[in-house]
Each structure stands twice: as C-alpha cells, then as structure tokens.
Amino acid sequence: MKQYKAYLIDLDGTMYMGTDEIDGAKQFIDYLNVKGIPHLYVTNNSTKTPEQVTEKLREMHIDAKPEEVVTSALATADYISEQSPGASVYMLGGSGLNTALTEAGLVIKNDEHVDYVVIGLDEQVTYEKLAIATLGVRNGATFISTNPDVSIPKERGLLPGNGAITSVVSVSTGVSPQFIGKPEPIIMVKALEILGLDKSEVAMVGDLYDTDIMSGINVGMDTIHVQTGVSTLEDVQNKNVPPTYSFKDLNEAIAELEK
C-alpha cells in the first residue's frame, strides 16, 4: 500500500456510527499521530461546529482538534463569502451552519428577499421554512445545498438526509442547487488548500461510495474504502471506478501501512 503524506477522513460510518465508535478508528488516528502524518476530518455534517465535532470524537477517546475538522457548513460559508462578501442568506439548518455563515460575515435573514438560499440538514424543518426557501429561489436567490446525502445512518437506521430536504425545494422550483459537500470537488479543494499538499500526496478515507469515495475520484485522489458503514465490498467492487483500496476496517489498513 502506498504511503501518503496526509489523509482526509470521513466521520459517519468511518470513525463512528451514531454514538458508537467504530473498531479501528482510534487506532488509526493514534497511528497517524505517532507517525506525524497530518489528517483532516472531512464531513458532510453541517449541523455541528468543528468544536462540537471535536468534542464528540474526544468522548470516544479519538484525538481531534477543531482546526482538523472541515464541515460542509464551513466550506459553504467560504464558498459564498468568496463569491459575494456580506451577502444576505436564508438558511435551513442547525447551529453549525448558522455559526459558519455568521462568522464568515454573511447576513442571515428570515424572509425570501435574499441573495442566497442555503439548505443544510434541519431536524426541526417545517412547511413554512420550506415555503420561504422556495419563494427565495423563485425570487432569484442563488440556491446552495451543503450536501446531497439523501439518507444518514443513525442508531435507529437510515433516516432522511439533507439531500431529501433539498429535493423538496428543487422539485418545487425546478432549480437544481449547487452542492458543496462530498462528492463535489469544492469541499475537497478546500481541504487540500488547508493541508498545502497536492492531490497525489493525499488519500480520502471513507465508507460510502457515492459521497466519500466519489469525492476522491472526482478530484483525482486515491481512495481508501472501509467496510464499516453503508457501502459493502461487493458494492464497491461492482463500480466502474472502484476505490484504490478496500479494507474490512481501519485496523486492516494499519496492518497494510506497516508492511
């Protein structure tokens, strides 16, 4: 197995499943730290701040720092502020997205007369929120969605994800959003900029083919699939472009790296 200078690592289905740590997750991060290999946690979760993500990982005894976390909310805020500094935004989403947009100098409004409509996972979504978002897009606001995941793994099973919520506005308006998170290149380019490395020197680690693995493939990066989440070995082997590697878990990846 190739030795990489850095790793981009998914969270849900790779580091943990809901509130449960996945076997090999802590060991993999400890291995990288001992070797002095940089890594970033790249997640489509827009509901949490980097500090909240870090706290969850630390509760599982997985080493993490806020500056090592790249969320779809952060990438979304950067994308908008680079295009339109100080723009007005109507958003659906949690505290992670709200904080990211505000700290980027964007103005959050509660009506449809805005420059951007941004949809992130909103566990308190209502018809009225969707109505305002729909009217905003119809009024000409640029339509952004933090990530396309139609479902998310939770302890109860696969629940509706942000892509499912986004589809309501998209179907109603006939307008397709610009997605920011995996598998789009936008969030991956942001992570590579933080690392200061070329894509050939970095590998993407994740469980879900359609987002994690495709995000690496879409930017020309090697990919490491772990069979600890949604996509099985059979799933990824049958794809036109399979991952560079597929392991039962991250313990198996460590064993390969140590050869």
UniProtKB/Swiss-Prot annotation:
Any one of the GO CC terms: cytoplasm
Domain of life: Bacteria
InterPro entries: HAD-like_sf (IPR036412), HAD-SF_hydro_IIA (IPR006357), HAD-SF_hydro_IIA_hyp1 (IPR006354), HAD_sf (IPR023214)
GO MF terms, alphabetically ordered: metal ion binding; phosphatase activity
Keyword entries, A-Z: Hydrolase, Magnesium, Metal-binding
Necessary cofactors: Mg(2+)
Pfam families per UniProt: Hydrolase_6 (PF13344), Hydrolase_like (PF13242)
The protein's Enzyme Commission number: 3.1.3.-
SUPFAM superfamilies: HAD-like
Cited NCBIfam families: HAD-SF-IIA (TIGR01460), HAD-SF-IIA-hyp2 (TIGR01457)
Note: In murine kidney infection models nagD mutant was attenuated in virulence.
Its job: Catalyzes the dephosphorylation of 2-6 carbon acid sugars in vitro.
Family: Belongs to the HAD-like hydrolase superfamily. NagD family.
Protein name according to UniProt: Acid sugar phosphatase
Organism: Staphylococcus aureus (strain NCTC 8325 / PS 47)
